[in-house]
């Protein structure tokens, strides 16, 4: 199974079942009466974070997934069966985005965190539900509501406290392998690491998750190479280690290397360059006379930025680890005990808009070149879908709903007259009075 950390899919909740018209025929109910049951509710689409799940591979080739629809009502007052929920398990760290609005719907940061992505439709009423002292034998029933449907992207952004960033071949993989029990592929050529590698680093009875972010290249923020693919994994990190190689084979100028990486981070998101960051010079064992380190240290000192030096190969890492954990403690004091800080856009709340019986949106009336009146109204659409025009009682009920919306009065104000044609929901109607 390959590692898949991005996919797009449409999810649809189940439709509500339809109510029915039926009449009681039991021996002990000689007067009969309405007996049509209600439709069952449609199943929801539920996403749930699971720490045992580490990939979106199972969704990679799925274009459209459906929850079960509710069953139709039955005779003898029997209701339809509710549809089963469709429960999709996703890795912790998955972000869900609505592709139509580009809005983040959910960010899973805890194991077993769940979210109803699409709500199932409510079941329609059968004629038994309309029985009253005034209407003892109603020929009324309803269709079930449609389930919600969304086209979304699912994207894993790895949950790490510390992200190690830099150009390819700066020693990031070597560093994380010496700090933790991670086993990245290490070789002396560019682009050895193609996916982020996570490792747990312990210090004084504390532990942090470090991530080796694959090497960035120039214009990574614009998608060059696998730029966007790599940069998005940095968004959750609270601390960044900016690793710069002192080996002249890797960079002509370490100062220029620093600026290029900072430029790519800034172009991708200003939030990245505002993160707490340690700039670290690696491969000091190659810089024998120390001139390249001194040049970089002086350059950063002029900017008020301290520079740490290490040799990951020789495991000279004690001071760096202590500095990272000290910085982490300052972060905890500032933000509290939350390990992972969500993007600011997650403060917004997602609200799904669909037609309902309580909608009071404005009525839109326009006249075409043929003199027909085109009417648009979300609430009216709801009732046209809800009430089948198959019985006289249903047609009268739909007529009452149209009057409640006030369509007749607004058509008169717009200039409509007797005999004019009204177009709504793909149907044509003639004004009779």
Curated annotation (Swiss-Prot):
Which positions fall inside the Obg domain? Answer: 1-159
Which Pfam families does this entry report, sorted A to Z?
A: DUF1967, GTP1_OBG, MMR_HSR1
Q: What positions does the entry give for GTP binding? A: 166-173, 191-195, 212-215, 282-285, 310-312
Top-level lineage group: Bacteria
Alphabetized SUPFAM superfamilies for the sequence: Obg GTP-binding protein C-terminal domain, Obg GTP-binding protein N-terminal domain, P-loop containing nucleoside triphosphate hydrolases
Q: Which residues form the OCT domain?
A: 355-433
Q: Where in the cell is it found?
A: Cytoplasm
Q: Which GO terms describe its molecular function?
A: GTP binding; GTPase activity; magnesium ion binding
Entry's Gene Ontology cellular component terms: cytoplasm
**Where, by residue number, does Mg(2+) bind?**
173, 193
Q: Name one GO biological process term.
A: ribosome biogenesis
The family database entries (CDD domains) matched by this protein are listed as: Obg
User: Taking every annotated instance into account, which residue ranges of this chain make up the domain OBG-type G?
Assistant: 160-329
Cofactor(s) annotated in UniProt: Mg(2+)
Q: Which HAMAP family match?
A: GTPase_Obg (MF_01454)
Question: According to its UniProt entry, what is the function of this protein?
Answer: An essential GTPase which binds GTP, GDP and possibly (p)ppGpp with moderate affinity, with high nucleotide exchange rates and a fairly low GTP hydrolysis rate. Plays a role in control of the cell cycle, stress response, ribosome biogenesis and in those bacteria that undergo differentiation, in morphogenesis control.
Q: Which family does it belong to?
A: Belongs to the TRAFAC class OBG-HflX-like GTPase superfamily. OBG GTPase family.
Subunit and interaction comment: Monomer.
Question: Which protein is depicted?
Answer: GTPase Obg
UniProt organism field: Mycoplasma pneumoniae (strain ATCC 29342 / M129 / Subtype 1) (Mycoplasmoides pneumoniae)
| Gene symbol of the encoding locus | obg
